[in-house]
């Protein structure tokens, strides 16, 4: 029995034997001897009545439709301590580092902003802070900063938040720090008609123009706000530079160029370019009607960082379309999802799309699609939709003008909420990883998807060399990978739930074992959610200890619709990590559980208890008549070590 899932092989016997011109129609392959078939070409064309799993022609359709040829797909998962499973957004500071700092937000009222540090090389997650900032629906780190981020909530407020400095030294005597709100941006007060505000409106998107931390864009209630952060620092109540009312606005993405005025926007009207110098924007009714009829409305769009003229947009019909602003038309359709697309990410020319169906699709766009003047339809490499079988020619055929460039990664059993892509410090395309959060409050790190059919994983290495031993010793002594260390800096390091999808073909079983990562031990392969180590719970404090670190500069009218609880600014020292939390009535209310810093060792063992003479008689255990209490006591001391280490029966031990 294999140690991984292998689907049942269901097939139908050939109703008619494949036609071979050199044989009679009623001839049977089994009756033909090798002396009759002297031509090697005739032997190769001869086909058996029975299904032959070793024949590539018989298994070609099965392998592609069931994805049996795929391997080398690896995902690591961590559980985010959000009991309500209400995650909303994820943001990362730097995509070109091996230890990125990222944040995960929730729409809960307390303990809903988590700050983590990810070790891409060692596959470890370190929790630094848990902050209470109610109802976060969108956020963005300031460019080139790991201390400040902007968050948006459901009340129409955006906050510039100062995050405590990450303590990597493990010094417990460091100065106490806490998160604080540096500035508030009130969107709701700048809308003329309060009756037009939808009660479900949230600040769904925040971003900066061209990595410039002085220009902030945000979406609230079908309005695009443009803020100047430099003027906001000097103003008591920040005022936006412009407010553009755009009906059906869903998302935007600034151009990755030095042009600080053009922004790509999308919504019910489709996709469009927007000039910030002309804040008035109207959509013709005919365009809205046509987009609604053809389901061309879009909810996501991302510019290609390698080509300023190309962007990808996710439309309501579940198709990702590639657009070229020079042609004012789309030149490719990427079809691979069965539900609404929730996230798009570019990574070195390739595109990743996440959907509510729980799948992440990697679109291999390495070839220059723009050089091809013909319209291109792109589909999946595997699955039932990727198979086009010609029964007359008995072979697979590609659809006309279709390129199979999508590979599916089943990343979640619920839905994908947000994604980020990282490449590491060496910017290697082979080390490309995708980060995701889903509706089950899981954070996942997915390795790049390879087409492993043509990859040879065989190795003639049968023993460790001296260089291998030295390399393993260095990795064991590293503070970044040593899980069992008692240092305070490693107390919050969490190992992932590692899931490796192996090939289900027997020919690739050995290759899949060789592709398993060597830096994850059996102790890190956790079997359930309860075994995962989560972030430490916030400390319960009294009302007398509350202390606001910085007073918010604003008038009383800003607090009519939104009230902050003072505990959001409480400096709490928890070991070497500063956290902020509300006062809790009990541990169950916190929604965060804490476990030991290192994985539990699950070693099989048996427990035995030494029995005296009376216990033998009461329990009716067999023994010799000459066996007395004194002999038993002497024998007990002699056999004590073996009883504790060897799982044998009492009769074998005491009658020996």
Curated annotation (Swiss-Prot):
Domain of life, source organism: Eukaryota
Keywords associated with the record: Cell cycle, Cell division, Cell wall biogenesis/degradation, Repeat, WD repeat
A Pfam family reported for this protein in Swiss-Prot or TrEMBL: ANAPC4_WD40
Gene Ontology biological-process entries: cell division; cell wall organization
SMART domains for the chain: WD40
InterPro entries: Apc4-like_WD40_dom, WD40/YVTN_repeat-like_dom_sf, WD40_repeat_dom_sf, WD40_rpt, WD_repeat_multifunction
WD repeat residues: 131-171, 198-237, 291-333, 336-373
PANTHER family: ANAPHASE-PROMOTING COMPLEX SUBUNIT 4 WD40 DOMAIN-CONTAINING PROTEIN, MITOCHONDRIAL DIVISION PROTEIN 1-RELATED
Free-text function comment from the UniProt entry: Involved in cell wall metabolism and required for the separation of the mother and daughter cells.
Recorded family membership: Belongs to the WD repeat DSE1 family.
Protein name: Protein DSE1
Gene name linked to the record: DSE1
């Amino acid at each position: 029995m294999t140690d991984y899932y292998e689907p049942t092989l269901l097939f139908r016997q050939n109703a008619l034997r494949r036609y071979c011109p050199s044989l009679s129609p009623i001839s049977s392959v089994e009756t033909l001897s090798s002396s009759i078939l002297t031509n090697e070409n005739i032997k190769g064309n001869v086909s058996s009545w029975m299904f032959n799993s070793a024949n590539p022609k018989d298994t070609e359709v099965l392998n592609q439709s069931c994805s049996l040829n795929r391997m080398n797909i690896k995902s690591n998962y961590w559980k985010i301590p959000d009991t309500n499973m209400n995650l909303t957004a994820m943001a990362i500071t730097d995509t070109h580092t091996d230890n990125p700092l990222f944040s995960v937000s929730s729409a809960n009222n307390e303990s809903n902003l988590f700050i983590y540090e990810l070790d891409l090389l060692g596959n470890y997650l370190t929790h630094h802070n848990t902050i209470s900032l109610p109802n976060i629906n969108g956020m963005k780190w300031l460019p080139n900063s790991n201390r400040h981020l902007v968050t948006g909530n459901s009340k129409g407020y955006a906050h510039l938040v100062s995050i405590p400095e990450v303590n990597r030294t493990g010094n417990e005597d460091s100065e106490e720090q806490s998160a604080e709100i540096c500035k508030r941006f009130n969107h709701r007060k700048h809308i003329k008609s309060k009756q037009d505000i939808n009660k479900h409106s949230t600040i769904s998107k925040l971003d900066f123009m061209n990595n410039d931390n002085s220009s902030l864009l945000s979406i609230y209630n079908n309005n695009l706000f443009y803020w100047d952060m430099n003027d906001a620092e000097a103003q008591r109540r920040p005022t936006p530079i412009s407010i553009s009312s755009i009906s059906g606005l869903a998302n935007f993405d600034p151009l990755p160029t030095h042009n600080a005025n053009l922004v790509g926007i999308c919504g019910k009207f489709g996709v469009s370019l927007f000039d910030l110098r002309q804040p008035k924007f109207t959509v013709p009714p005919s365009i809205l009607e046509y987009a609604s009829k053809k389901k061309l409305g879009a909810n996501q769009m991302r510019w290609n960082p390698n080509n300023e003229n190309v962007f990808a947009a996710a439309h309501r019909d579940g198709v990702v379309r590639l657009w070229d602003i020079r042609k004012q038309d789309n030149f490719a359709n990427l079809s691979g999802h069965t539900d609404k697309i929730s996230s798009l990410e570019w990574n070195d020319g390739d595109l990743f799309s996440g959907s509510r169906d729980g799948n992440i699709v990697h679109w291999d766009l390495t070839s220059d699609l723009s050089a091809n003047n013909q319209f291109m339809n792109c589909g999946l490499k595997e699955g039932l939709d990727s198979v086009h079988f010609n029964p007359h020619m008995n072979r697979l055929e590609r659809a006309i003008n279709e390129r199979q460039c999508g590979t599916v990664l089943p990343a979640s059993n619920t839905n994908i909420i947000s994604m980020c892509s990282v490449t590491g410090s060496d910017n290697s395309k082979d080390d490309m990883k995708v980060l995701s959060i889903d509706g089950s409050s899981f954070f996942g790190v997915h390795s790049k998807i390879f087409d492993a059919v043509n990859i040879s994983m065989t190795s003639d290495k049968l023993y460790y060399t001296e260089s291998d031993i030295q390399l393993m010793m260095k990795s064991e002594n590293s503070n970044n990978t040593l899980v069992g260390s008692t240092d305070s800096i490693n107390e919050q390091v969490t190992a992932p739930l590692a899931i490796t999808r192996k090939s289900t073909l027997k020919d690739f079983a050995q290759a899949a074992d060789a592709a398993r990562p060597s830096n994850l031990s059996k102790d890190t392969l956790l079997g359930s959610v309860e075994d995962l180590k989560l972030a430490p719970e916030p400390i319960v404090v009294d009302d007398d200890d509350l202390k606001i670190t910085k007073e918010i500069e604003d008038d009383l009218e800003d607090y009519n619709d939104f009230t902050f609880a003072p505990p959001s600014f409480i400096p709490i020292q928890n070991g070497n990590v500063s956290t902020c939390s509300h006062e809790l009535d009990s541990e169950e209310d916190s929604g965060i559980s804490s476990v030991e810093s290192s994985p539990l060792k699950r070693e099989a063992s048996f427990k035995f208890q030494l029995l005296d003479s009376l216990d033998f008689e009461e329990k009716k255990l067999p023994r010799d008549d000459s066996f007395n209490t004194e002999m038993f006591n002497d024998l007990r001391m002699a056999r004590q070590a073996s009883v504790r280490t060897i799982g044998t029966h009492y009769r074998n031990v005491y009658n020996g």
